[in-house]
Amino acid sequence: MFLVGLTGGIASGKSTVVSILRELGCAVIDADLIARQVVRLGTPAYSQIVQHFGDGVLLVSGELDREKLGAIIFSDPEKRCVINSITHPQIRREMLRQTLWYFFLGYRYVILDIPLLFESRSMTRYMKHTMLVYCDPQTQLERLMRRNSLSRDEATKRIAAQLPLDSKLPLADHVIDNSGDRDNTRRQVLQLHARLESSLAYLPVRITAATVATGLVVLACGLLRRLWQ
């Protein structure tokens, strides 16, 4: 099995690509979903965030106010680093757990959907391939304004908080251009999926795992024989 890092930019259409991959039966680990789970009410990350930022980031229900927290993240780099230092270790642990589960299920490759894959840098070394969902800057801006009901200035600020898509292009092994319609995007995803499925890059890990498993079985059998002698 090998890992494929999937990334994009805000409103570049990564969710569309993920939905197509899931339709194809691909294993996708969603870092954003995990990030929401690790800060649920009562979790260690939740307690640390409240301790650092105070009750002002909470809803009446006691849960984190994601809009307020998002405004902090996008407007203050130092506070963004604080939140990342709280949540990222727990996110990585859960991603590892899910990756191992897909390995035991026999998947040839697993997609790690990580919005800030190239910004964080630390995760790219684990990826056999990286995939970027791209769209032109004007399309990205218009999509974000429409999707989140933001002004042009607000949308521009949120886009500026991430590495520009054009800067990510040379960092990616594969690019899905999502500037057009869904059918065009789907064709690109199908082609890439076929290439990844036909790759033999998964074999070394499988062979190593099989060798280790065989060795453990032989060792266990030897111990059992001694016990019964």
UniProtKB/Swiss-Prot annotation:
ATP binds at G8, G9, I10, A11, S12, G13, K14, S15. GO terms for molecular function: ATP binding; dephospho-CoA kinase activity. Residues 3-207 form the DPCK domain. Pfam families: CoaE. It comes from the Eukaryota. The keyword Translocase does not apply. The keyword Transit peptide does not apply. GO terms for biological process: coenzyme A biosynthetic process. Keywords: ATP-binding, Nucleotide-binding. HAMAP family: Dephospho_CoA_kinase. Belongs to the CoaE family. PANTHER family: BIFUNCTIONAL COENZYME A SYNTHASE-RELATED, DEPHOSPHO-COA KINASE-RELATED. This is Dephospho-CoA kinase domain-containing protein. It comes from Xenopus tropicalis (Western clawed frog).
